[in-house]
Swiss-Prot record:
InterPro entries: BrxB/BrxA. The lineage of its organism: Bacteria, Bacillati, Bacillota, Bacilli, Bacillales. This is Bacilliredoxin BLi02323/BL05224. One of its GO terms (biological process) is cell redox homeostasis. Disulfide bonds: none annotated. NCBIfam families: YphP_YqiW. Belongs to the bacilliredoxin family.
């Protein structure tokens, strides 16, 4: 790909990245960052696999942000990787989602390095945002 195209795409997705980062999510952009984070993972971590698709913009990101900020119980850490943009980081994070098909957008709640709750695209696309938020907050209540 051309450098101009890559720069265009970086600028295009910047607001999509910032929506989660500004809400306190730590963005992991390289496989090394994912490895370093996961090596020390203790407690609970809520992971959002971000995406450029419409259901990420209209449902996944807003539901994740509102669930984290509005829940009485919540994870110890919130992180995000960006599918289709930070491919190596996303692939490395998905290695921890053993038994789950790659899906973007998607969300996972981990205890240590083990997935205890997973929300694939199929449980995001076509749903009401309140349903997605409830799915997330129910997982927080059960596991955090």
């Amino acid at each position: 790909m051309s450098t101009a195209y890559e720069e265009y795409m970086r600028q295009l997705v910047l607001p999509m990245r910032q929506e989660l980062v500004q809400a306190g999510f730590k963005e992991l952009t390289t496989a090394e960052e994912v490895e370093t984070f996961m090596e020390d993972a203790e407690g609970t971590t809520f992971v959002v696999v971000n995406s450029v698709c419409g259901c990420a913009a209209g449902l996944a990101r807003p539901a994740a942000v509102q669930a984290v900020s509005g829940s009485e119980k919540g994870p110890d850490e919130t992180v995000t990787v960006f599918a289709g943009q930070d491919r190596e980081a996303t692939a490395k994070m998905r290695e921890y989602f053993e038994g789950y098909e790659p899906s973007s957008p998607s969300m996972a709640l981990l205890k240590g390095k083990e997935v205890v709750h997973f929300i694939p695209r199929e449980q995001i696309e076509g749903r009401e945002m309140t349903e997605i938020m409830k799915n997330i907050t129910d997982a927080f209540e059960k596991h955090c």
